[in-house]
A protein has these predicted regions:
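Short linear sequence motif anchored by a di-proline
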Residues: 1-224
Length: 224
């Protein structure tokens, strides 16, 4: 799974993803956590890339604005096309890119109880994008809530060693696949969900301060 990550500031995202319209202003976050509003990149009907901040934890359109009781921060690739929560936005082409500088995963230690957090980055993309889905759900008060989820998949070798219980990792898009992920037909988009090569990933042990979401500063990504 992917439950915590580092997000760039709005100017960096606008440059990296060539955005033409945005609805945001925010600093970088070193400890993005579920239920927070997170920056995402989407394609408008005219094809232009736009940015917005969405609730992290997908609320399906049929949920009437109420967060499901089960976790929806990650959409497993195995259920992407037919799972009750995901198939609607998938078939409607509601795909997005969730920009990141890196993400955190926890490695269970030899005692079977303690966990060591690791910070994962790429050595070929400073700012990269998770493959995501988004949806809009209107509550009883008539207010629409836009929300998103990160697609996850079986881990590569490095992530198997770090995320050593569930063996999962987020789907990270190759730079050349970003446009197609946003605009292609679902069948083509599905082929873009690939294991990112572990040779292009770096895992760094970091402080357990990251365990607490209220801790949010650059020291969280300093090696220990």
């Amino acid at each position: 799974m992917c439950g915590r990550y580092v997000s760039p500031d709005e100017a960096s995202i606008e440059r990296e993803f060539t955005l033409v319209r945005t609805e945001w202003q925010f600093p970088p976050s070193y400890n993005v956590a579920p239920t927070q509003k997170v920056p995402v990149v989407r394609a408008a009907q005219d094809g232009a890339r736009t940015g917005a901040r969405l609730h992290w934890g997908l609320i399906p359109f049929w949920a009437k604005g109420v967060q499901p009781k089960y976790s929806t921060i990650n959409a497993t690739v195995e259920k992407l096309t037919d799972g009750a929560t995901w198939r609607g936005p998938w078939k409607r082409g509601q795909r997005c890119i969730i920009p990141a500088l890196g993400f955190y995963e926890w490695q269970v230690q030899a005692d079977g109880k303690s966990k060591q957090p690791f910070y994962l980055t790429l050595n070929d993309q400073e700012i990269f994008g998770f493959a995501g889905l988004w949806d809009s759900s209107t509550g009883a008060d008539g207010v629409a809530i836009e929300s998103c989820t990160i697609v996850t998949m079986p881990a590569n070798q490095l992530m198997t060693e770090v995320h050593n219980v569930k063996h999962r990792m987020p789907a990270i898009l190759a730079v050349e696949d970003r446009e197609a992920w946003l605009t292609a037909a679902p069948a083509e988009a599905f082929t873009l969900i690939k294991q990112y090569p572990d040779t292009h990933m770096v895992a760094t042990a970091v402080s357990t301060r990251v365990n607490t979401p209220k801790n949010n500063d650059a020291t969280l990504i300093v090696p220990v």
